[in-house]
Amino acid sequence: MLCIADKTFDSHLFTGTGKFASPQLMVSAIRESGSQLVTLAMKRVDLRNHNDAILAPLLEAGVTLLPNTSGAKTAEEAIFAAHLAREALGTSWLKLEIHPDARWLMPDPIETLKAAELLVKQGFTVLPYCGADPVLCKRLEEVGCAAVMPLGAPIGSNQGLETRAMLEIIIEQATIPVVVDAGIGVPSHAAQALEMGADAVLVNTAIAVADDPVMMARAFRLAVEAGALARQSGPGSRRAQAQASSPLTGFLEAYS
């Protein structure tokens, strides 16, 4: 069970809506993933038209929508987009994304913190996409963000948990949920994130561009479930040396 602000989720897997070959395939994959929270880029849909090809099937599926401000380059642009989304969709939940460089899509830490603080004061439930910076994540928590979403690797890169060392610090010090976002390329990456203590992962590209997105969505669902169970079970500590799991000499006593 995962609690963020005023909502509770059974699934620790959040999904995106970009890059799918068709809206029908998108919905099928989301259903198979078991995801209950789905991000939606406001620049890709007609927010005022609930019959929009992408928006309509999501509303029908009954998932919680998390509109994002992807495409915003400044805090001002992100705040403007947030208010449009709240008016059109009737939700104060927001994935805050500000990345001024279209090539690398790295989140702007200064503009993100600035926008997050203002949006929280304006009544939004803010989940900021940010770099794997422990100091920044703590500052975002302090201004009232409902969760933080540090990247594992650049968006869409499928590189995995390249920022693992920093993610471990973020997870250890956080008192709000940590959702690893961006760069997760295969189910094992998602399992590793949950094993190390992340509360959830957000996956889009790895599912959408797979040869069989629906099958990949199921694989991610199972991986996230396995990672969460592994964490809850209390795995043994790592050791520098070997340690036998059974006596090495007991059976030799009769021989001697």
UniProtKB/Swiss-Prot annotation:
One of the Pfam families matching this protein, by short name: ThiG
InterPro entries: Aldolase_TIM (IPR013785), Thiazole_synthase_ThiG (IPR033983), ThiG (IPR008867)
Recorded GO MF terms: thiazole synthase activity
Cell compartments where the protein resides: Cytoplasm
Gene3D superfamilies: Aldolase class I
Pathway listed: Cofactor biosynthesis; thiamine diphosphate biosynthesis
EC code(s) of this entry: 2.8.1.10
Catalysed reaction equations from the record: [ThiS sulfur-carrier protein]-C-terminal-Gly-aminoethanethioate + 2-iminoacetate + 1-deoxy-D-xylulose 5-phosphate = [ThiS sulfur-carrier protein]-C-terminal Gly-Gly + 2-[(2R,5Z)-2-carboxy-4-methylthiazol-5(2H)-ylidene]ethyl phosphate + 2 H2O + H(+)
CC annotations in GO: cytoplasm
Catalytic residue positions: 95
GO biological process terms on file: thiamine diphosphate biosynthetic process
Chain sites annotated for binding 1-deoxy-D-xylulose 5-phosphate: 156, 182-183, 204-205
Keywords from the UniProt entry: Cytoplasm, Schiff base, Thiamine biosynthesis, Transferase
Stated role: Catalyzes the rearrangement of 1-deoxy-D-xylulose 5-phosphate (DXP) to produce the thiazole phosphate moiety of thiamine. Sulfur is provided by the thiocarboxylate moiety of the carrier protein ThiS. In vitro, sulfur can be provided by H(2)S.
Subunit structure: Homotetramer. Forms heterodimers with either ThiH or ThiS.
Protein family (similarity comment): Belongs to the ThiG family.
Name of the protein this chain belongs to: Thiazole synthase
Organism: Enterobacter sp. (strain 638)
Organismal lineage: Bacteria, Pseudomonadati, Pseudomonadota, Gammaproteobacteria, Enterobacterales
Gene expressing this chain: thiG
